[in-house]
Amino acid sequence: MSQPQSSQVTKRGLTDPERAAIIAAAVPDHALDTQRKYHYFIQPRWKPLSEYEQLSCYAQPNPDWIAGGLDWGDWTQKFHGGRPSWGNESTELRTTDWYRHRDPARRWHHPYVKDKSEEARYTQRFLAAYSSEGSIRTIDPYWRDEILNKYFGALLYSEYGLFNAHSSVGRDCLSDTIRQTAVFAALDKVDNAQMIQMERLFIAKLVPGFDASTDVPKKIWTTDPIYSGARATVQEIWQGVQDWNEILWAGHAVMIATFGQFARREFFQRLATVYGDTLTPFFTAQSQTYFQTTRGAIDDLFVYCLANDSEFGAHNRTFLNAWTEHYLASSVAALKDFVGLYAKVEKSRADRSRRRLRGAAASSAIGRSITPDKIGFRVDVDQKVDAVLAGYKN
């Protein structure tokens, strides 16, 4: 049988009228918490606070010794050798707040999946109409079998390699908004690779004997001099770099902005219609949309947040300039190899004049893509274009 509580035990509890009165008297007569918004700790980029920011910011553990973090303490688990789950030593760049970055497109999981679903539906409608119209008959067989199937097919390995380069970025980056930008950019790259193979498989269904296997494109990517420089650059970014900021900058601000844009837009997309190919531009247009979306996010991260950081801006621009110098040289070498592909297309159809190529290389591949004024980088465009055109063969 339970024993009744003593008066001493009872007086220790909050039910004791005397103690309750003391507590009530000590409570201020004004509101204890004047901040009634749940996300008061998020600094909004836009007004009001966007859904993207509410669902993205500070989801990742954020100790205060990582700039911008709001928590405290150390990690309960670490990698072998003592490396922390996340740490400032993962990059050479510095900032007063890693959580300042915002994707201008405000992409998070739901709108990203929604956009991809819409793309899949209109792609299905386009391919059904293309097949029904018999539009495949307008493609020049040489372009279809030799250039499109083999060399455009080989480009998927460049896209896939750059996709894989993001794997460590998605793990090591120091804020959740940067992680979303990196992961969505990575998924767009693998989407590009899949679209190239989708086009080849689609053609194989319409053209008897068309080989849609990846054996020949893989051999071209790994052995053909056309892709020698591109392959070396992609391999370096993917396997030779530890700094996650360097991977993002080298890949998106330099390699993709130069070699990727020239190969995809200036060669395959521009020449496709000359050879009666209206199929390839449909897919490359989607890739160009991905490029522009990611470009806005990369610009926000590296220019707005890092190059213009109030305390570490000069430090960061030093590294961005060094990285640009290094990877621009590699990308120019890749372009020099790639323009040799013009020797495989007919002069009368390719508009292969040296002036035409010089303009394409200067304006779209080097001049506008690097945006040197934003980080203080200086480049001799004419010298770089001359280096590219050294690989041009009449």
Swiss-Prot record:
It catalyses: methane + NADH + O2 + H(+) = methanol + NAD(+) + H2O; methane + NADPH + O2 + H(+) = methanol + NADP(+) + H2O. The keyword Disulfide bond does not apply. Keywords: Monooxygenase, NADP, One-carbon metabolism, Oxidoreductase. The keyword NADP applies. It holds the Pfam family Phenol_Hydrox. One of its GO terms (molecular function) is methane monooxygenase [NAD(P)H] activity. One of its GO terms (biological process) is one-carbon metabolic process. Its EC number is 1.14.13.25. M.trichosporium has two forms of methane monooxygenase, a soluble and a membrane-bound type. The soluble type consists of four components (A to D): protein A, comprising three chains, in an alpha-2, beta-2, gamma-2 configuration, is a nonheme iron protein containing an unusual mu-hydroxo bridge structure at its active site and interacts with both oxygen and methane. Responsible for the initial oxygenation of methane to methanol in methanotrophs. It also catalyzes the monohydroxylation of a variety of unactivated alkenes, alicyclic, aromatic and heterocyclic compounds. This is Methane monooxygenase component A beta chain. It comes from Methylosinus trichosporium.
